[in-house]
Amino acid sequence: MSYFLHIDTAIVSASVCLSFNEDVVGFLSNPLQKDSASWIQTGIRELMQNSGVKLQLLKAVSVSAGPGSYTGLRVGMATAKGLCYALNIPLITINTLKMMVVAAQNEDAELFCPMIDARRMEVFTAVYDKRLKEIIVPQNIVLDDKSFCEILETKKILFFGNGSNKFQELIKSQNALFKKIEADAKHLVTQSIEAFKNQIFADVAYCEPFYGKAFYSPAIQSFRHKNKI
């Protein structure tokens, strides 16, 4: 039985979570993204003190590794790597989009499409089923009124995240569902424990966040004519 620290600074708010295996024993968050760099160390210290657990008892650290805020990702990854290096414990990286789906799994939908705002009409996105199987790989796309049209003909898709508002203004399909769902470090726990059991670890020395830079030149226009299921 082991303690795990989970860090998320990828989107709007920063949060840290302490779990005893899959059981959450402590959680703290900070809603201001611009304060993540100054808050994260203090937040972790306060979390551990409130829980009465020493850092030396941690078995691993997990971090939301992107896509997301460039600055936020750097802050979270640097913090996680520093702790893992100092404590000589494994680093576990979790895709931010998949973390978001964990927060939405109990919703009534066949497929889940988290969207992270990029710029203009662009979003980082992917599509997953209830078992977190990747239906459409994470990528950056330019939204239009034909995006996801082929899948929406036969499947109900839940769109959520801080980029989904842009798509809600475009799409008319009855199979397109929208809901505000907040994801945070607590939603890293299950995947992180599974990765730990399977010894799926990142390289502490060379691991970098997934910024999604490659998709900016140019961004994929939309999902129509591609990614059929």
State each model region's role.
Residues 17, 124-128, 210:
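Conserved hydrophobic/aromatic positions in well-ordered beta-strands
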Residues 31-42, 70, 74, 78, ...:
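Residues at secondary-structure transition points
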